[in-house]
Amino acid sequence: MTFSPQRPEFETGKQPDPETEHAGDFFEETSSSAPRAASNGSSGPNYTLITTFLAALTAGIFAFWAGWTRKWISDDGLIVLRTVRNLLAGNGPVFNAGERVEANTSTLWQYCIYLVALVTDYRLEDIALWLALLFTTAASIIGVLGTAHLHRKRIAVLLPAGVIGYFSLSPARDFATSGLEWGLSLMWISIQWLLLVLWATSGKTSGKKASGAKTSNPIVNAGAITYALAFWSGLSWLVRPELAMYGGLTGVLLLLTAPRWRVVLGILVAALPLPAAYQIFRMGYYGLMVPHTAVAKSASDAVWGTGWEYVEDFTGPYNLWLGLALLLAAGALTVWKTDKHLAIPKGRLGLRTPGMAIALLVICALVHFLYVIRVGGDFMHGRMLLLPLFAILLPVSVIPVNVVDRGWQDLVALVLVFSTWVWSTVVFVQGHQWENTGQHVVDERDFWIDFTNRDEDHPPLYAEDFLTVDSMNDYAEVMRDQTLVNPTGQQLNILASSDPTTYSWITTPRVEGVEAGDLANLSPTVFHVNLGMTSMNAPLNVRVTDLIGLATPLAARQPRIEGGRIGHDKLMDLEWQVAESATPLAYTPGWLDTQKTYEARQALRHPELVHLFQTYREPMSYHRFVDNIKYALTTGRTLEISDNPEDLLKEFNPTPAEIQDGLETIAWPGEIKLDEPRGEPLYSSQ
């Protein structure tokens, strides 16, 4: 994407409007020793345009190939697809039909899959894989075009650098697919970067001559790009919550540089309605201000030490600091070649410059890095650091090397780029050597290949590929022959044999009579630590819950385990889960504490828990919607319950657990719609 730098002057005698005047910036004006492509009288090839196209093509091909060779789907990716199944069936954007729980972090990602599923018969796993891969590919191309636009006035060869370094990293290739929203997030960041660059180069600049103003990029309408950037910034919150920082700071910059109140109003109108409308919907429908995953993975505590260990786990295997040093040094040389005599931007209106666009993106990325470190990182190798890394590498996604009037900086930049390519090649070939030793941070792709008892060349791609996990032994058979045939309270995972280690599944009957009460409205329930593989291998009329709290509010509200695995540091006891199901107390599994199970069932009627159940189970109505908004703004932000039911029983007058009739309702009857089986796989991993 290149634009001819036409420079129409104002009419004679007219001075530029001080409210729209901006000073030039170092990427707008190149040094006198580096002639502008547009002002060169040569009829030779446009090296900048040609190499922009080649760099974008190279980046796209490399990103696609890198992601394709590591294609797979994670258990967390399957969680998203369960919500999509409920959307397709007509049960709403929920994980379990009848329970309004937002189990996915990215709002837009689930709807992207849903929209494609509406018009195709492809399996959801295939749709998720292809969308993620195409979004990732688009992100690499758009990122290159955005950076190349900064150098459009040079006569230079643009060499792909940062984008090559990024996709040489094993986790970057792993999360190019995986079923998660990383491809969508990368594309959002890239488009945000491109729009920032176009915005920064489309205002009016004051040149060295005082006679008039000139338009730095007349092909892009300055007003339209401002509102487009505002709208795109508003979407940040719906892509991933932490991207709201990028969108929010961009919005602040747009407001600061707005020349008139009418523009300020236009920016607000473009940016706020969609995210604000969804936020009202989220609070009224789910009873929360944030996705439910944010409640389960509470980030309220600062664990800097653990976070830095997470950084070292990511940087160490790839000598990432070396790669970053090479890329940032090449970027610094690009800045070094700028004309030191350019006017310094003055006033708030002078902030509309490419330099400010770069500074904004870098600041956002650095703050993002700090946030990840503060919350302790993640349990997946490199995952949470990929987005800020991609963002900070965008300004150096390509490095310009001047074709004419080359200086020593060009030679050094060329050496640095080639060194980056060598480093990237070594890192790409070497990969990430990981062994499952039970550590807190795991290579998620290799973990699931190992956990599903598959080999490296056949990673899991579909829900049924996870049935080879040891703990999923006979899961589908018990589901088909018992859970869906007989009145069932729960389907439970058991250790059938310790030598050799063998797992199996059993079922419990359903409550009846006075012990049932409204618990009889609960569907047959599967309880397991991994939500994706259990839920995607079960029909929608089977309720699937977890002990971490991703889809289980009762678990999400329990206290964190000190020193636990980041992101998985809440583990609800099985006694709570049996109590909060349609399982008769007499059939409490023998390995559980029967007294604790009894007390947990009593504690379900604690006023705070009753209110919690109402927010996501009571049928939707105007009253429920309004009450949920109030709850989201108050109790929903802070509620934490003890994992010991005895503590809760001290706070109210409990009734005997054997009698559930006539109590405050915590489960409501409702119709559950089933989805239709989808088409054959596009390819086979077998």
Swiss-Prot record:
Primary localization class, coarse: membrane
Q: Where is the composition biased (Polar residues)?
A: 29-42
| Residue ranges of the region described as Disordered | 1-42
- What phenotype is described for loss of this gene? Cells lacking this gene show an absence of the cell wall-bound corynomycolic acids and of beta-(1->2) Araf linkage.
> Where does the record place Basic and acidic residues bias?
8-25
Protein name, as recorded? Terminal beta-(1->2)-arabinofuranosyltransferase
**Looking at the record's lineage, which domain of life comes first?**
Bacteria
Q: What does this protein do?
A: Involved in the biosynthesis of the arabinogalactan (AG) region of the mycolylarabinogalactan-peptidoglycan (mAGP) complex, an essential component of the cell wall. Catalyzes the transfer of arabinofuranosyl (Araf) residues from the sugar donor decaprenyl-phospho-arabinose (DPA) to the arabinan domain to form terminal beta-(1->2)-linked Araf residues, which marks the end point for AG arabinan biosynthesis before decoration with mycolic acids.
Organism, as annotated: Corynebacterium glutamicum (strain ATCC 13032 / DSM 20300 / JCM 1318 / BCRC 11384 / CCUG 27702 / LMG 3730 / NBRC 12168 / NCIMB 10025 / NRRL B-2784 / 534)
